[in-house]
Amino acid sequence: ENISEVDRLLNETDDRYVSLNYDCGHFYFANEDPLKAIKKYMPRISHIHLKDVRDNIKTRVEKENLSFLQGVKLGVFTVPGDGDIENMGEILSYIKKQNYNGWVVVEAEQDSAVANPFEYAKMGYEFINKHMNIW
C-alpha cells in the first residue's frame, strides 16, 4: 500500500463505488508518510484503521526480507502511541479537524500471550483521547 499503488487504484476507479480503507500502520510499513497519505486521500476515505509500528521489528523484516505476515507475527504492529510513528498525534488531530464521522478501528495485531489485550486497548484509548478529546 504505497502512494503510487493507491493513486493508481483511486485514479482508475469511480469514487461513487470505490473508497479507501486508510491504515496509517500500513502506509508507514510501506515507508510512506501516513500523515501525508491521509491528507491526500481524505475525500475518498470511508474507513480508518489506526495502529502504530515498532521500528525495530520493521527494520528486522526489511533486513531479513521477511514477509508481511512474519512481521505481524513478530509484533511489528501495536496500538496508537506505543510505536514509532512520530506524527501519530497529528494524524489523530487531522481526523478530528476534518469532522470525519465514519468507522475508526483500533488495531494491535499482537500475540495476546505477550501483550495483554485489555492493557493495550486501554493504552490505545488513552492516547487517542489525548489527541482527539472525543470521550
Protein language model features and the residues they cover:
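Histidine-acidic metal/acid-base catalytic patches
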Residues: I3-S19, H26-W135
